[in-house]
Amino acid sequence: MSEIIYTVVLIVLGLPMLLSIINYRPFFDWLQNSDLESWHETLPALINDRLDERRWGDMPGWLAALESLPDISVQYYDFSVGVTVGDATDITNEVRDQLQQSLMGLHPWRKGPFELFGLPIDTEWRSDWKWERVLPHLQPLKNRLILDVGCGNGYHCWRMLGAGAKRVIGIDPSAKFVFQFNAIKKYVGAEQPIDIL
């Protein structure tokens, strides 16, 4: 049954390459064995509907941006102080240029800041400032299951994971944010317990 669900997601989107770009398999595997198991049967259809390319005229460009992201081996990432992935010394200038061009295909980025391999992603908002104001008022996030409704591109989701959350699930009505989030997740791995639906 699980294989059917994953295949349905790809067929409805009409994009077989999506499996390697937006990989929900670890999330669905976790979901099937969690207290939220009842969502395992219905959630794929909801995701299919939401990410149907007929609803989003810009989706081909977003897909192209994700597909063009260079493959880079990540030695380091940190979400506790900010959202930082890799180091500038991990990539050549040529790869940095390709990375920057790919990320520009997902602009504008609303929430941030993010830094990938020494390359800051220009964002409209400084969500780190909000995080610093909110954090002292939160109960400890260690080992918590978190649902972030209206998560945008997931900046605060990454910060919650960095604060020790067991799993973070974000939901937002904008498909573009799903693509921005997955540009970051490409480099930290699909197995990370964080997803945006």
PLM region spans:
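N-terminal accessory regions of S-adenosyl-L-methionine
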Residues: 14-127, 186-187
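Conserved alpha-helix/loop element of class I SAM-dependent methyltransferases that forms part
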Residues: 125-142
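Conserved class I S-adenosyl-L-methionine
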Residues: 144-152
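Conserved SAM-binding loop of SAM-dependent methyltransferases across substrates and taxa
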Residues: 153-164
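Short beta-strand element of Class I
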Residues: 166-171
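Conserved SAM/SAH-binding beta-strand->alpha-helix loop
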Residues: 174
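Conserved SAM-binding loop
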Residues: 181-182
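S-adenosyl-L-methionine
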Residues: 185-197
